[in-house]
């Protein structure tokens, strides 16, 4: 989101520029070189699952060696030798690239790669590589909570909010407390929170039998167990807020606050913005009327509410599926199901999209897709009720949604194709007749093939366009590939999908994980565009940052800049730039919904 008063601190994360001053982390100090022949090895810093393909990336300005080795850290013995596979293309100033494939190494332990007179950072190989990361990422979600925030041990925005555009007189009080702050700012969106809530519930449902979710925190996010998996506590935080946004069967509200929020850095409990009812007081709550909205000169292009309604129904129906299993939460489950049914009908009555609202800047969530959401909602309602009309609806909406996606495109509007992959196709697949199963698989395959083509345009096989929030696209691409494999048992995309996972965890030009504080001994974003972290100088674990963008996007956005000199200058390219700098909200701002989607990906990898 658009910032206001950023600070100018910058931290160096990786070995950098051959021309500028270099700054090393302890993690990489052993790799320091200063010659023009310097080479770099990029790995998945979290490590590799024993059975997974394992492909590192290496690059340099000079021709690369032919052979590489894998060395065990403890014994210093070489345990694997292989031939480097040259890859076509360049990145920035680097003209020579290769892949180091050690997939056949199945031994558990801690190792490093040796290649071209350089050693990689240590990495692990283990069957349990991904068992903790989903749970660890919940720390970021708790830190984003609005209302009582356990990370801050403080209450914020208890006055949310007063209505706009609804059937009630403008300025009428509506209890919209709770939920999550969207990113580095303090807005709250049903548009993103519905997706986050549903993906958390799906993560729990898919991982429930694999003992990867812990109970270390209570419902308030305090460090006390409560006989409920922490991921369910977090999902319920989202569900409870969503229920407040649907106070009557015919009403749905969709956004709290707007970009008037961007008025200086403060902790959430120290709110100062005036939305017309006094400094730090009530914030506006927008009603979902399916029409263009905007209380100043910038208007959305809304033409319905089915995108919100479909995701809302999916989250509520998933909540019913999970919470109806326990006698203590069965009544709550039926409340969820009733709300899901009601809002789904609102979506059927007003097909189209309700976009996010802006006020003083042209940036908003400009979603244009909705059949995918209605498909997902209908599929989950059928799973919850067994009522055939929901299945018929899901199939109808699936045909309309088809292959519509950002995949294969060089550009797209901000959150135009949202969610970034269609979970409706996956959730419909197992309950659909055979002919529809084949169709759904073909839809997923179409996007994966297009992304494969995109991946061939860069030496790292990143299969996404580097638009704003590209890391969310990477998460979606990998998730779609793993779900396709679950659906069809077709493993042709597995290596490609794992390269996307590896990209997020360090196998990228900048050599950094894109997840805050993960892995603990690795290189990860430190100077993130997040008010709580910046003010308190206290790191938070588990948040996925927006990720690299086209250089032209970075140069075009309002209020974005970096400290100079750029410590990552050697690794920037016209195709993508990334900065671990608080002033760059386009690449280094963690997002709530991106983190929730990543939790589903981490769950899929843990149970794989």
Ranges and model annotations:
Residues 230-251, 256:
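Carboxylate/His-rich catalytic cores and anion/metal-binding grooves
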Residues 41, 45-121, 127, 139-198, ...:
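Aromatic (Trp/Tyr) and acidic
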Residues 32-34:
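Boundary at the C-terminal end of the N-terminal hydrophobic targeting segment
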Residues 13-26:
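Bacterial N-terminal signal peptides
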Residues 356-367, 408-415, 458-468, 517:
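Acidic, Ser/Thr-rich low-complexity linear motifs
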Residues 295-303, 314-365, 429-430:
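C-terminal transactivation domains of fungal Zn(2)-Cys(6)
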Residues 1-10:
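N-terminal secretory signal peptides that target proteins for export/translocation
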Residues 219-231:
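Acidic, glycine-anchored loop motifs typical of Ca2+
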